[in-house]
């Protein structure tokens, strides 16, 4: 089923060229079904790229989805034109009285900083607090997952000895979890980070389930038992060339990074990487929308005001 978006959003041209099903507002309004309302808090500097990546995956789900974008007003974007932000993004003050079936909190290139030193940290914690009564299920990605665990459960991130970058094998630890419906026993996906959270901290400080993990990546996917909190430390949404662009960016600024693992054929950066995680990515996002959101969210989203006991950090 399609996603419904502003007709002027630049990502639409890319998505239509890939034969992604986009529905205009006239057609959407004639369907006798309540669309899912999803808010994307986009913390990535390359906003338009991340928009396209996430919308591509949401468009593969079997439901009509209305998508809105949120940005942190306390942070000035250096890589996205102000006109784009003003046209397609909303501030927290503009959405704080609304309700959503799902919230996606993206990663951000700030993981080597203490959380409290991130310039929009206080505003982000307001969003986390607000989501208790205004969002049914929240999907936290990469740094967004670490930020959510830190604020909601007191689980801090731990530095790795070197950057984890590449395509890594992960094992499904809970095949009975709805998020893993349709997955094989193992899958691969991109990871790109300098920090991690430990299994010991998750066991000692939360009652979250470890849904997937890997020998090289450690914890990969965590979830609350009712799927209203979902944490993914990888990057299912990454394009074929995203890690390549990150690698070349790091080279240009003199970081001298290792070649991303299991990515370039023959570890040769001049070769085009193989796309090996697309099916797992589509399955994961479809499962989140269907099982964590659609099957359980109230028809009247205002009812979320009356039922927020699922958050263990209240």
From Swiss-Prot:
The main location is: cytoplasm
SUPFAM superfamilies linked: Class I glutamine amidotransferase-like
EC number, UniProt record: 2.3.1.31
* UniProt cross-references to InterPro entries, sorted A to Z: Class_I_gatase-like, HST_MetA, MetA_family
Q: Which GO MF terms does the UniProt record name?
A: homoserine O-acetyltransferase activity; homoserine O-succinyltransferase activity
Q: What residues does the record give for site: Important for acyl-CoA specificity? A: 111
The keyword Amino-acid biosynthesis is annotated on this UniProt entry: yes
Enzyme class label: transferase
Q: Which residues bind substrate?
A: 163, 192, 249
Give me the Gene Ontology terms describing cellular component. Answer: cytoplasm
Sites marked Important for substrate specificity: 192
State what protein this is by name: Homoserine O-acetyltransferase
Which species? Streptococcus thermophilus (strain ATCC BAA-491 / LMD-9)
Q: Which reaction does it catalyse?
A: L-homoserine + acetyl-CoA = O-acetyl-L-homoserine + CoA
Where do the catalytic residues lie?
142, 235, 237
Q: Write down the CDD domains for this protein, in alphabetical order.
A: GATase1_HTS (cd03131)
Q: What does this protein do?
A: Transfers an acetyl group from acetyl-CoA to L-homoserine, forming acetyl-L-homoserine.
